[in-house]
From Swiss-Prot:
Cellular component, GO, one term: extracellular region
Signal sequence residues: 1-26
InterPro entries per UniProt: CRR_secretory_protein, GNK2, GNK2_sf
Keywords: Repeat, Secreted, Signal
All copies of domain Gnk2-homologous, residue ranges: 33-136, 142-253
Subcellular localization(s) per the UniProt record: Secreted
Alphabetical list of Pfam families matching this protein: Stress-antifung
Protein's UniProt name: Cysteine-rich repeat secretory protein 41
Similarity remark: Belongs to the cysteine-rich repeat secretory protein family.
Length: 266
């Protein structure tokens, strides 16, 4: 299939304000808008159409029904050819009651930025929301990657790249480990930290929970290959797809980091 949304690479500059507003010592839990894509190929729906009705129904109920223990939902509303697929995934530290506020923000953000689009994705710090007329369960989306990075460089670029990549790689293994379960469900998320010289790097990786563990690993390996483009020597960086993403910073940006990763020797 050809690109549904087209691919995009955002230059570092966009992230400057976002990344420079943090200090090492304070945990500021932001939920900044990051990016969106309106699908051109899926077209627009008409006012009063069955698609609109289905979309309105699913978006009006999405934050009020069900539980948010895994911060994820993939749901379908209506019947072919007017069915709507909606997926959201909250960040791994933003489940339960932390999740619905981000989704509400994302719903209004998506409606404002992609009015009447049948397909659209919006990214925030703490969640992702996607609507589509095309099913995507357990399919890696390779078409909508983008990255954000802090324009400032580390002095020891080589060491920093090597050690940060190694941390992310380790987290990718952990996130996609089939034995890394929350009850019976795959966790598909991992966070950790690591000392590099005098600095400490904080990092996370995550997949959307429609993926099976092998696909999660495949997705993460795909975006980790973009580390050189995104993140070469940068003091902070993130690569996003729709199906997975990673982030690292020199300050803590999550509500908590897992103990096992923190204690692991490097
Ligand atoms: C963190 O957030 C607090 C409250 O919103 C703000 O006063 C403070 O300046 C922020 N710190 C940084 C480093 O942005
Ligand atoms: C973060 O901490 C809370 C409460 O201690 C816990 O319920 C939650 O599972 C933790 N999240 C992660 C990702 O470890
Ligand atoms: C970081 O390094 C790159 C590549 O060497 C350079 O183009 C860029 O200007 C540097 N950024 C800063 C803020 O010095
Ligand atoms: C994580 O580490 C903290 C501090 O070392 C400890 O108090 C806490 O019980 C640990 N949590 C788990 C789930 O092991």
């Amino acid at each position: 299939m050809s690109s549904v949304f087209g691919s995009v690479h955002i230059l570092a500059m966009i992230a400057i304000q976002l990344l420079l507003t943090h200090s090492v010592s304070s945990l500021n839990l932001t939920n900044a808008y990051l990016h969106h894509k309106c699908s051109n190929t899926q077209g627009k729906y008409k006012q009063g159409s069955a698609f609109e009705k289905n979309l309105n129904l699913v978006l009006s109920t999405i934050t009020s029904i069900g539980n948010f223990r895994d911060g994820f939902r993939y749901t379908e509303e209506g019947e072919d050819p007017n069915n709507v697929f909606v997926m959201f995934q909250c960040r791994g530290d933003s489940y339960w009651s932390k999740c619905p506020p981000c989704i509400s923000t994302a719903v209004s953000g998506l409606r404002r930025r992609c009015p009447r689009n049948k397909g659209a994705i919006i990214w925030y710090d703490q969640c992702l929301l996607k609507i589509s007329s095309v099913a995507s369960f357990n399919k890696i989306d390779y078409e909508n990657d983008f990255y954000l990075s802090n324009p400032n460089n580390m002095s020891d670029r080589g060491l920093f790249n090597k050690e940060t990549s190694a941390l992310l790689e380790k987290l990718a293994y952990k996130a996609s480990d089939r034995n890394n379960l929350d009850g019976k469900q795959l966790v598909l998320y991992a966070a950790g930290e690591k000392r590099i010289g005098t600095k400490k790097v904080y990092a996370m990786v995550q997949c959307t929970k429609d993926l099976i563990f092998t696909k999660c690993f495949e997705c993460l390996e795909g975006i980790l290959r973009k580390f050189p483009q995104c993140c070469d020597g940068k003091r902070g960086g993130r690569v996003f797809g729709t199906s997975c993403n990673f982030r690292y910073e020199l300050y803590p940006f999550l509500r908590n980091y897992s103990n096992s990763t923190m204690r692991a020797p490097y």
